[in-house]
């Protein structure tokens, strides 16, 4: 009995490798996804009793793939029609012309905004030119309130919350590293 079990193993080692992946639990391989040309049993992968059942890999013909027209359902268009429709929708003549008209004023607007800031920055930077940005910045409250001006220190000395006499601390007087919001245009730092 052990001799008969060893003979198929020796014959499997002499066989050429199979062109498809084999597993121990796989008994037969079927080409079930193709049409009737390859629906027959190709090879018994494990434990073939003799070489007579083995089909040589050279004998296996490549499967016959059906033409594209037979796979396509009757309602769907062909690939040529789909590609022509896609090409017509992506053509370079008609679609870019409507966006070009609104883009021309949009392209000129950033140019005007880039030209305008140098005319507005010098008046707003004149009060900040007297004191360097590393020194203490002074913020004056609006004219309606009678509280004292808040002094803001640099970020090196830490945040400072000013509390005028007899008043609760204001949220606008708390600063960490940013200058307070001013009603006018901000100074460039």
UniProtKB/Swiss-Prot annotation:
A motif (Nuclear localization signal, and RNA-binding (RxRE)) lies at residues 2-18. Residues 178-189 have a biased composition (Pro residues). Phosphorylated. The modification Phosphothreonine is found at residue 174. A motif (Nuclear export signal) lies at residues 82-93. GO terms for molecular function: RNA binding. One of its GO terms (biological process) is mRNA transport. Induction: Down-regulated by P30II. Residues 1-27, 87-189 are annotated as: Disordered. Keywords: Host cytoplasm, Host nucleus, Host-virus interaction, mRNA transport, Phosphoprotein, RNA-binding, Transport. Rex escorts unspliced gag-pro-pol and singly spliced env mRNAs out of the nucleus of infected cells. These mRNAs carry a recognition sequence called Rex responsive element (RxRE or XRE) located at the 3' region of the long terminal repeat (LTR). This function is essential since most HTLV proteins are translated from unspliced or partially spliced pre-mRNAs that cannot exit the nucleus by the pathway used by fully processed cellular mRNAs. Rex itself is translated from a fully spliced mRNA that probably readily exits the nucleus. Homomultimer. Multimeric assembly is essential for activity and involves XPO1. Binds to human XPO1 and KPNB1. Interacts (via N-terminal nuclear localization signal) with human NPM1. The RNA-binding motif binds to the RxRE, a complex secondary structure consisting of four stem loops and a long stretch of stem structure, present in incompletely spliced viral pre-mRNAs. This region also contains the NLS which mediates nuclear localization. These overlapping functions prevent Rex bound to RxRE from undesirable return to the nucleus. When Rex binds the RxRE, the NLS becomes masked while the NES remains accessible. The leucine-rich NES mediates binding to human XPO1. Belongs to the deltaretrovirus Rex protein family. This is Protein Rex. It comes from Human T-cell leukemia virus 1 (isolate Caribbea HS-35 subtype A).
């Amino acid at each position: 009995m052990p001799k008969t079990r060893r003979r198929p193993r020796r014959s499997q080692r002499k066989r050429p490798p199979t062109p498809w992946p084999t597993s121990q639990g796989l008994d037969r391989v079927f080409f079930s996804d193709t049409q009737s040309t390859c629906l027959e049993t190709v090879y018994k992968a494990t434990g073939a009793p003799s070489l007579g059942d083995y089909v040589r890999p050279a004998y296996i013909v490549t499967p016959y793939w059906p033409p594209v027209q037979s796979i396509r359902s009757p309602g769907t268009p062909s690939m040529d029609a789909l590609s022509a429709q896609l090409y017509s929708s992506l053509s370079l003549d008609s679609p870019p012309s409507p966006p070009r008209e609104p883009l021309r004023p949009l392209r000129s607007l950033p140019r005007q905004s880039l030209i305008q800031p140098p005319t507005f920055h010098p008046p707003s930077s004149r009060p900040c030119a007297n004191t360097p940005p590393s020194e203490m910045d002074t913020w004056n409250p609006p004219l309606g309130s009678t509280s004292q001006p808040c002094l803001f220190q640099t970020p090196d000395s830490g945040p400072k919350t000013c509390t005028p006499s007899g008043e609760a601390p204001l949220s606008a007087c708390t600063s960490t590293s940013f200058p307070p919001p001013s009603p006018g245009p901000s100074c460039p730092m």
